Amino acid sequence: MEVNKKQLADIFGASIRTIQNWQEQGMPVLRGGGKGNEVLYDSAAVIKWYAERDAEIENEKLRREVEELRQASEADLQPGTIEYERHRLTRAQADAQELKNARDSAEVVETAFCTFVLSRIAGEIASILDGLPLSVQRRFPELENRHVDFLKRDIIKAMNKAAALDELIPGLLSEYIEQSG
């Protein structure tokens, strides 16, 4: 939705000056600006920018907290003390936020999602392969049955591999982690 500076300020409950400051900080402008031209914004793009900016600010705060705690020297922290527990909590929060950001930006995805997608694609491929011998037989009627049967056998092997993909992924993931780690 296109909005002007005043409408955007109302949406965020902020002043027009704040909107101007955000614009200087990189908030996306749809069009306009310059001498005498009203600036228009795409509200969805601005909300996305604001959320990303807010997450970056929060990450920076957590990073600073972690760094302050590290400077306090991890060796000096005694298990069971408030400082030690605060250090563990802050580090866990920072790690969780970084993982969430990586997931939100699609830098990482869950294994279950990959298994789901690959299994669905494998099923579609198996369906196409299943009709291939009949298509070849119709297209080339001069082929003997032994040729078509040979084709069917190899296609069945490929279909079985595709069908077992969802069972193979966890093992392949473990193998990948072992080799890359």
UniProtKB/Swiss-Prot annotation:
In the record, biological process GO terms are: viral DNA genome packaging
- Where is it localised? Host cytoplasm
Effect noted on mutating K35R: No effect on ATPase activity
**Principal localisation:** host cell
| GO MF entries | ATP binding; ATP hydrolysis activity; sequence-specific DNA binding, bending
Q: What EC number(s) would the UniProt record show?
A: 3.6.4.-
Winged helix-turn-helix (wHTH): annotated segments: 1-29
Residue ranges for the region (Binding to terminase large subunit) are 141-180
User: Which region ranges are annotated with the description Self-assembly?
Assistant: 110-140
Q: What start-end ranges are recorded for coiled-coil regions in this protein?
A: 52-109
Q: Name one GO cellular component term.
A: host cell cytoplasm
The record's similarity note reads: Belongs to the terminase small subunit family.
What is written about domains in the entry's comments? The N-terminus contains a winged helix-turn-helix (wHTH) that binds the viral DNA. In the homodimer, the wHTH motifs are positioned on opposite sites of loop and probably bind to separate R elements in the cos site. The N-terminus also contains an ATPase site that regulates DNA binding activity. The central part contains a region for the self-interaction. the C-terminus contains region of interaction with the terminase large subunit.
- In UniProt terms, what function does this protein have? The small subunit is responsible for the binding to multiple recognition elements within the packaging initiation site cos. The terminase lies at a unique vertex of the procapsid and is composed of two subunits, a small terminase subunit involved in viral DNA recognition (binding to packaging sequence cos), and a large terminase subunit possessing endonucleolytic and ATPase activities (DNA maturation and packaging). The terminase binds, cooperatively with the host factor IHFA/IHFB, to the cos site at the junction of adjacent viral genomes in the concatemeric DNA.
* Name of the protein described by the UniProt record: Terminase small subunit
Species assigned in the record: Escherichia phage lambda (Bacteriophage lambda)
